[in-house]
Amino acid sequence: MKIIGKFPKTRLRRVRNEDWMRRLVAENNLSTNDLILPIFIREGKNQIEKIKSMPDVYRYSIDKIDMIIDKALNLGIPMVALFPYTPNKKKNNLGSEALNENNLICRALRKIKKKNRNIGIMCDVALDPYTSHGHDGILKKNKIDNDETLKILVNQSLLQAQ
């Protein structure tokens, strides 16, 4: 092969000509190290509830979390993300349950951390699981009040980080 010029005037493309070569020299690989396992949690004991809107996905009561975490660790998954299901009776316009130190997320976090496992835990800092209107913020005059929402989200973050 004769090279006509030098970089930057000549840019060789031979490693991009064929699909197999592009796959061979690709910079990115996906492994279990790149995965985060979502865990949907609910109130109760000994509960595994099918989520109708998501095939083959379930909500688990806190006492079942160990089983899920063990599976994640055995598969080499380094992190889980917790998503709470809040019953309507615990929801209100201000999302007050988000600031309850004994809410579902906080109890699940304490249970996972108590075992001191080598797994990362991610939680959603959001109000939509806790508000009766389903928005991710405090509504005032049919608009989200960002300042009030941020105050609550800061406190929710601090609570989850404990």
Label every model-predicted segment.
Residues 2-10, 18, 27-36, 42-162:
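Alpha/beta enzyme core
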